[in-house]
């Protein structure tokens, strides 16, 4: 599972950077991120599971049981891949329809975000300027101490650490002060965004278009279920031989073990 966790963590980190609030490039759509995450997670689980199965079959117990789990796992993986290929166009159509139906709401929220961005930008620039000034002051204070360390070598290391400690604490305290000021400055805009979002959602709920959207969403889900049903049934049929083979191998292993015990 470590590989799965690492894969998911990498996806979230890169995704959060790609959708940074202040970036200028067009961000990836939410639906594309959902699809990419699902695909990456399934692939990670499948690959990690295969590694565990391979390790078990290579063990002494796995060789003794001879369940042929790896062959069954590969067959299962092929069936799942086939299902994904069959459902690909169906799910794509569903996401496209849903994205189209909610386009107006995203446009309104983007307008609100752009307005807030322009208003808070001066505060962010001021915060960045003050922080750079603090770092520069810290650097100027530390630089003579670094020179002193190079000249005095090890005997002055402890003395240098004692001198650096209050400087680091001073930088930390100043940073906290600037962050608190920035948080206070941005709080009204954060509250305003929450109020606007609540207003948008309330207006959406009370509007006639909400019932229409709900009907469209229900229709899209119904269509998705109908189109996915044959593919899921095919997957079930494809898994039957795998399950039967696994059952037969397991029963055979138990029978062999019983014979060995009775012959002793």
From Swiss-Prot:
Its main location: secreted. GO terms for biological process: acylglycerol homeostasis; cholesterol efflux; cholesterol metabolic process; lipoprotein metabolic process; phospholipid efflux. Glycosylated. The keyword Ribonucleoprotein does not apply. The modification Methionine sulfoxide is found at residues 109, 193. Residues 67-264 are annotated as: 10 X approximate tandem repeats. Keywords: Cholesterol metabolism, Glycoprotein, HDL, Lipid metabolism, Lipid transport, Lipoprotein, Oxidation, Palmitate, Phosphoprotein, Repeat, Secreted, Signal, Steroid metabolism, Sterol metabolism, Transport. The keyword Repeat applies. Residues 1-18 form the signal peptide. PANTHER family: APOLIPOPROTEIN, APOLIPOPROTEIN A-I. Homodimer. Interacts with APOA1BP and CLU. Component of a sperm activating protein complex (SPAP), consisting of APOA1, an immunoglobulin heavy chain, an immunoglobulin light chain and albumin. Interacts with NDRG1. Interacts with SCGB3A2. Interacts with NAXE and YJEFN3. Belongs to the apolipoprotein A1/A4/E family. Participates in the reverse transport of cholesterol from tissues to the liver for excretion by promoting cholesterol efflux from tissues and by acting as a cofactor for the lecithin cholesterol acyltransferase (LCAT). As part of the SPAP complex, activates spermatozoa motility. This is Apolipoprotein A-I. It comes from Castor canadensis (American beaver).
């Amino acid at each position: 599972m470590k590989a799965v966790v690492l894969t998911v963590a990498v996806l979230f980190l890169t995704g959060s950077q790609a959708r940074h609030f202040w970036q200028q490039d067009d961000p990836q759509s939410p639906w594309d991120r959902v699809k990419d995450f699902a695909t990456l997670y399934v692939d990670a689980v499948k690959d990690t599971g295969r590694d565990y199965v391979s390790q078990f079959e290579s063990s002494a117990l796995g060789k003794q049981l001879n369940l042929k789990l790896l062959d069954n796992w590969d067959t299962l993986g092929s069936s799942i891949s086939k299902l994904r290929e069959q459902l690909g166009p169906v799910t794509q159509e569903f996401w496209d329809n849903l994205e189209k139906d909610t386009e107006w709401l995203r446009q309104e929220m983007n307008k609100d975000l752009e307005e807030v961005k322009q208003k808070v930008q001066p505060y962010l620039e001021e915060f960045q300027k003050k922080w750079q000034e603090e770092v520069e002051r810290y650097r100027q204070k530390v630089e003579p101490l670094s020179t002193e360390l190079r000249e005095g070598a090890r005997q002055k290391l402890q003395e240098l650490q004692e001198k650096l400690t209050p400087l680091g604490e001073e930088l930390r305290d100043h940073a906290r002060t600037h962050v608190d000021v920035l948080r206070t400055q941005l709080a009204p805009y954060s509250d305003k965004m929450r109020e606007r979002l609540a207003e948008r959602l309330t207006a959406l709920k009370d509007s006639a278009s909400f019932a229409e959207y709900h009907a469209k969403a229900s229709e899209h889900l119904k269509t998705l279920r109908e189109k996915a049903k044959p593919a899921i049934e095919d997957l079930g049929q494809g898994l039957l031989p795998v399950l039967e083979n696994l059952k037969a191998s397991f029963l055979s292993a138990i029978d062999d073990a019983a014979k060995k015990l009775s012959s002793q």
